Structure formats: C-alpha cells, structure tokens
Amino acid sequence: MNKIHLQKEAQHGTPQFRFQAFSQRDTCGQYFAPYHWHDEAEFLYVTEGSITLRTENSTKLLTAGQIYFINPGTAHALFGNSEVSHHYALVFGLELLSFAQYDVCQNRYLEPLFSGKLLFPPGDTFEPETSVQIGQLIAQAEQLYHNTDPAVPASLSIKIILLQILEILFSRQAFLPSGDNARWKSSEEYSLRPVFEYIEQHYQERITLEQLS
C-alpha cells in the first residue's frame, strides 16, 4: 500500500512563480479532493452544477456562479454534489503579490494579509454581480496559466488579475480581522491535523475511532 499523504508538502507552481490553476470537470458526480491543507490561498469559482466544500468548521454547498476563498492553512475537502459540475481553482502563495519596493500599498493592504491580521472572506454570500465579476477574473487567470504562447505575458497578467480581486475585496471592505493570533500563523495544530497525522503514521495498521478521538 502506498503511503497516504494527507498534507500537501510541495508548494504549488514553481519557485519563480508560486501559482497554479486548475479546471475541474466532473461528469459522473464522483468528484473528490480529500482533506488537505497548504500554506497558500485558494480561490474557487463554480461554473456548472454544484460541489460540497468541507472545512474543519463548516460545510458549504457551492452552486454555479458562486465563489469561495480558502485561507492559507485551512484544512478542506471537496466533493461532487451534482451529476455534472465544473469549477476553477487558483492556488498561490500570498508573497507572489509582494512589491519589491515597500510602499503604501504594501503597508496598508498586503502586509495585513501576509501577517494573517486579515483573512479572506468566505465569498459564498456575495451579491451575484460581485461573484460574477470575481469569477470571471478567476476564469481568466486559469486560461492564462495554460496559455503557452510566448508572446502573451501570462505571469504578469495573472498577477494583475489577483491584485484586481484584492482590489474588489478591499473596496467592499470584505476582508475579516483575524484577531491577535492569526489562525494560519499559529503554531498550534488544528483539531483535524493530529487525526490526519496519526492516520499517516499508522496507515498500515487497523485504526479505531477510539484511537482517533
């Protein structure tokens, strides 16, 4: 039996550009992304059907037209909920958006995100026009990511798009304060993490619910 990796150890993208985009289509209602977490943000946009997103604290049914923001370090899983579904996912390290020269933008908007003082909002309750606006940007970023035309400045365009999404969120005052101890910066493990780690260490053994409790 192969060792089951419950935590994604590898960073997405490349060291030169920590960004990766996915277009996930399910035609049999069996889409499944098992519980995992990473130190990168993840943006979701459902374009067809519906999927179920489960995190440590909530279960969300995301339907066509909805977006969702997953903060770095949040354990999550995705499940197909309709016979046919499609969604985009963007995964990237927040430092991708950092400026070489420290300025008011870095200080006022980006640094609170990098430090964990501000968290992305869930996004599933946004007004339809906001969801469409952000969703279209997510789709554009995914298409650019897979564009192999060397004449297209894809990485630059993707970075601009991500900043545009942040601009929309800041203009709507949508970011959430995290308190003094940022959730994803904390040295404490989430309640699910010890469970995942125990399974990973004992995957060849018979595991009971009592052992996981």
Predicted regions and their residues:
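Short, conserved beta-strand element in jelly-roll/cupin
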Residues: 36-53, 69
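Short acidic-glycine-tyrosine-enriched beta hairpin
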Residues: 57-72
